[in-house]
């Protein structure tokens, strides 16, 4: 069955009207998070909203500064969700931690995603077993190419453009594949999840939330948001962080209260 995590048993149960799911992409070692995206499904307003938290976001753990992508390694899901809650004031109902290769398997299972790649992408990192070679333009991304696209990092604007690109890809994936005609694939996808994904989503949850498939009749139903903040210059430790502080925290919490069921007043 699916690898459950008992430490997260105190997570809030999803309501009938909406829920928040945290998508976590881990690196090849499975230690740090490579991507963090909150997906809010509003069944009442028939909307799906996505919010990405940049992996370089600075957080404090036991009085020390870290990038949020280290939380998974430092204190597991519990610490990661705690830090996301500190930044956003939202409850996470579901989580799915995805290792490299898993997204590709799901994309292949669904027959690829039609996508317009914005630029030529070339990158290689043998340590991560990551080799990217994509051409600009409209194409069908199979699983391998979808993985390459979502893991590409050499943007001029760095992580911000990367999170926007990941959102854009997931928007295309949801629009094209969250469709009743792909409902027959649910068992296959669930099998992949059982093998490769750490999650608290059960088959019962999937069936309970099947109405989500009806939401995605048009692209206007999917909205993407960025976490407000800015990059600082290199600190004394030689690390550059993305800062969500002071007015940006208030801005983010206000955004989350408005669109992600957050509790900030």
Enumerate the predicted regions with their spans.
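Non-catalytic, solvent-exposed segments at the cell envelope interface
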Residues: 1-265
